[in-house]
Regions:
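A conserved beta-strand/loop capping segment in the N-terminal third of enzymes
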Residues: 42-55, 61-113, 167-173
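Beta1/beta-strand and adjacent pyrophosphate-binding region of the FAD-binding site
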Residues: 1-12, 29
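Active-site/ligand-binding neighborhood in enzyme catalytic cores
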Residues: 87-227
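Short alpha-helical segment within the catalytic ATP-binding CA
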Residues: 15
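General small-molecule cofactor/ligand-binding pocket signal
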Residues: 29, 204-208, 339
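Short hydrophobic core segments
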Residues: 5-7, 31, 223-236
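Glycine-rich FAD pyrophosphate-binding loop
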Residues: 18-47
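C-terminal segments that line or cap access tunnels to active or ligand-binding sites in enzymes
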Residues: 227, 236-371
Length: 372
């Protein structure tokens, strides 16, 4: 007998399951259609090289939320890794995010902060204008426009200005990618961290289990209304795409083993030029300099619109998407005994710490739902 079913073994679902099991004594069953836990944070050790690979793209944990940091440290220790990214433009490598070092290297100048700020422009109405207003046309065209066009397969003039809001621009020489108080990578890997979260006598995990497969007993049609559910899958799928499918971007990864101790000297190298088909190359060994390897693994990352069967990564959020989402949110709010959460369940981009923080906030409400 189970008190709560959690659909999705990503960080939102696992946080919800662990708290409900350990703090409220609920017996929780976690379902995931994949063959592993951890959601998109899942990592695996390459059998040929022993290098830890982030299967769904680079994941770096960072947060300034004390509550989240205290919580995650119950399940893993973190390295002192600090993320730094570089970008290649026309055969030259520049530090990212855009900072005084990037600006002065690009212009072959020695600008101070005030002079660099003066490169910007007027108030923006779309992503193209937002980028220019932040850093001026030359820098925007070099580092943002082509990269964004590859990411979204859309002219930046047709994208909302909000998409670029996550891109920091600094008028000093700080090239640390994140500014959060805490940052690092789980010492034993993301999968070990997630397994520790699920390691509780009140938690049962069932992998390779599709919540919508009526041939397995814990399917949507049989449990909704009978057992409380935390649902972290796509919200449109839960309602059988009643109002249409929501738009997502997906990623393709091409993995290659390289017979060299160091391919690019950095974990992540972006490629800003539209003439290069991929957006970046990951070299995962550099995430853990405390580990030693003789060879390497690189992964090229490509971005495109998601189609049926693809893994959804980033919500597109067009006007049509937002109209559909409003309808799905109304249906979700009226769905008794089901809590919708996480990146897919709420149709929003969430960093790892944000997903965990959201789950921690919502645990009491879910526990109350399960007690009815």
């Amino acid at each position: 007998m189970t008190d709560l079913i959690v659909v999705g073994a990503g960080l939102y679902g696992l946080t919800m399951a662990e708290r409900c099991a350990s703090q409220y004594g609920l017996k929780v069953t976690v379902l995931d259609r994949r063959s592993h836990i951890g959601g998109n944070a899942f990592s695996e050790f390459d059998p040929e090289t022993g290098i830890e690979i982030h299967k769904y793209g680079a994941h770096i944990f960072h947060t300034s939320n004390e509550r989240v940091w205290e919580y995650v440290n119950q399940f893993t220790q973190f390295t002192d890794y600090v993320h730094r990214v570089y970008t290649t433009h026309r055969g030259e490598v520049f530090p990212m995010p855009i900072n005084l070092g990037t600006i002065n290297q690009f212009f072959r100048a020695a600008m101070g902060p005030d002079a660099a700020r003066d490169l910007g422009g007027a108030s923006p109405s779309n992503l193209d204008e937002q980028g220019v207003s932040l850093i001026g046309r030359p820098l925007y065209d070099a580092f943002i426009r082509g990269y964004t066009a590859k990411q979204w397969q859309t002219d930046p003039k047709d994208l909302p200005a909000s998409i670029i809001s996550r891109l920091p621009v600094r008028f000093d020489y700080n090239n640390r990618y994140f500014n959060d108080t805490y940052e690092g990578l789980p010492k034993d890997g993301y999968t070990a961290w997630c397994e520790n979260m699920a390691n509780h006598p009140n938690i049962s995990v069932q992998l390779d289990t599709d919540f919508f497969d009526v041939s397995q007993p814990l399917n949507r049609d049989s449990v909704v209304g009978s057992v409380p559910v935390v649902y972290t899958g796509p919200v449109d799928r839960f309602f059988d795409f009643e109002f249409g499918e929501l738009g997502w971007r997906t990623l393709d990864f091409v993995r290659e083993t390289v017979d060299t101790a160091d391919f690019q000297g950095i974990p992540v190298m972006n490629y800003a030029d539209e003439s290069v088909p991929f957006t970046r190359i990951h070299e995962f060994k550099h995430f853990h300099p405390e580990r030693t390897y003789d060879s390497g693994v690189i992964v090229r990352e490509f971005s495109r619109f998601a189609q049926g069967g693809d893994e959804p990564y980033y919500p597109v959020g067009t006007v049509q998407d937002r109209e559909k989402l409003l309808q799905y949110r109304q249906r979700a709010a009226a769905q008794d005994g089901v809590h919708f959460g996480g990146r897919l369940g709420t149709y929003q981009y969430l960093d790892m710490h944000m997903a965990i923080a959201s789950a921690l906030t919502n645990v009491p409400g879910v526990a109350e739902m399960a007690a009815r």
